[in-house]
Amino acid sequence: MELSHITYLNIIKNIDLTPPESVTIPPQIKPELVTLASRHATLPFLLPYINDPQYLPLLKQQAKRMLLNYCQIEQFTRRIVSIFEKEQIPYFLLKGISLCDCYPTPEYRKLGDVDLYINDPPALEKAKKLLKQNGFVLQDELSDHHLTYSYTFPAIGRTCLLELHFRITGLYQYAPANAVVDEVFSANILKHTCQTVNGISYYVLPPTEYTFYMLHHMLKHYLYSGFGIRLLCDFTFYLKRHAREIDFQRIHDWCTRSRIFHFYEIILQSCRLYLGLPDTIDPEIQYKETDCEQFILKILSDNDMGTVTGNTLVGSGSYRRITPLTYFKEGHLQMHVRFPRIGKCPLLWPALWGITFFYFVRNTYKLRRTTLRDTLHAFHKSNENSQLIRIFDNSDS
């Protein structure tokens, strides 16, 4: 591991250490360190260590922008939940300011859109109507687990996005994993808990379910395009705060049944080795340090939310080998995403497969602006990356 990587990880680890450990930054690695922190949206964390006139204005500017963005996203979140709570619509706030609150300096965690989960179908339909009545605009986006709404604040002209989840995460090819996720986060079983952020109470997932959700959120990003250090920081800080409230045996059971236990192991051990997660949290879980180093290097080589290229093809699982049947399975899943209702009728599948393939080819050349060959090659490469985490035991089931 390069010196810049080691130094960067020590700085991240220091965020929540009291007292912080001494970190020495050799002058020759400062440019690379600033570039790395910029890619991972963590520039403000360098402020205690770098005061060079060459870099300090950039660090301060980024810190101010993140502070402003935090305030705006917090107001956006308050607006949405006030609309729902006024009409007694049950919801779960995912990530966002809920996770920021676990950081020593909440404003230094990058925020994007707002994610809310509604697992009750009648409540979801009511929420959609309310959003439309309150100036939210539904975006034309194909997703198997959420709807995207935009809202523009008249006073400042800023447009913010809301992802309204009707499933907690996207579908996998591996059906048992989908079944476990649906069971854990179903309306009949899942109970909300309250979290107070800056004096305002929000409904959030209970700690055990929140931990399981974060694992699946990271897994989906990893299978798609990878992810940056922020998601590992989220996981680390959340577990540090809520470890006593988390039922780790249930986490083990859910991960085992959905066959993502190896992913949980490498995440937990990597957070211990590189981000300061205490060894006392779920101590029975261990993983090979060499694999963890390879994993963290993959994380550091990506951007904040992964490396999205124009020829990315989203994979819903990990395969021992890529065959024509693999592409057919992925295409079949995309058919269900594109046609969630009529896709339930097997008699229509042949026609829907053809339509799905037509849109895939069209999007490859017109939207992704690449070739079919390059897209499939990138899919091969993405599958190679997923072998490290042994997801679904790399099953072709």
Predicted regions and their residues:
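Conserved NTP-donor binding/palm subdomain of two-metal-ion nucleotidyltransferases/polymerases, i.e.
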Residues: M1-G112, I118-S397
